[in-house]
Amino acid sequence: FEVSKGVSLGLTGKTASGKSALASLMLKFNRAENIYINEVDINLINKNSLRSKILYVPQEPIIFSGSIRDNLTFFSKNFNNNKAQESLYISKFSKDVELMPDGLDTIVGERGLSLSGGQRQRLSIARAIYQNPEVLIIDDTLSSLDVDTELSLIENLKNHFSKKILIIVSSRISTIYGFDNIIVLDKGSIIEEGDSKTLTKNNGLFSELLKVQKILPKEKVRN
């Protein structure tokens, strides 16, 4: 499959279908024989260079013991407040930070404020946005969010990455419904590919998962 700039791609399938494994190949966590970026074999690209362009937000977000500011910048002294505020807004985390005792300087993690699962997920996404990648891969990192927050966050991401590449891995069909392209995996293979409406009509695994999961937000159905 190919992913072009400006495209939102959803990866879905049953548990252990190969979604996360495919995402890991794009970052050279495992060796792949046929992945190219701008027609260049990723095996010929330095890992540090590759990971400066492609950022991956894992299922279990990593929060550092330090301030919100430190978590956004990876403890870098080069802090850009405008970028920080934009990242927090896109990730739907800005209001949470405003309510914290010291704002961006609030200490979180083992030595400070304990964050909920949803807050941890949104902070990890804000950190990725702050790093300004060409490709953002989010691996089932929205599971703790309520439907409205998730919907708004995804729309923010799609707008922000309208000239880049956004890839979201999700077992929850509602998360990626309405994306430009959706790939359905089963047992390590791509079995379906297309937009939501096409896949729904195909009566394949995508359609089956829709029926099993039953509910889609009305806003996403309209897409």
Locations of regions flagged by a protein language model:
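C-terminal portion of ABC ATPase nucleotide-binding domains
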Residues: E155, Y177-N223
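ABC ATPase nucleotide-binding domain helical subdomain, centered on the C-loop/LSGGQ "ABC signature"
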Residues: Y36, L44, R69-E110, E155, ...
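A short, proline-enriched helix->beta-strand linker immediately N-terminal to the Walker B motif
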Residues: Y130-E134
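ABC-fold ATPase nucleotide-binding domain signature/coupling loops
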Residues: E2, A32, S94-L123, T141, ...
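Catalytic Walker B motif of ABC-type/P-loop ATPase nucleotide-binding domains
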Residues: L136-D140
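The feature captures the beta-strand-to-loop junction immediately N-terminal to the Walker
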Residues: T12-K14
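ABC ATPase NBD Q-loop/coupling interface
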Residues: N34-S49, L151
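Helix-to-loop junction immediately C-terminal to a conserved catalytic motif
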Residues: M26-K28
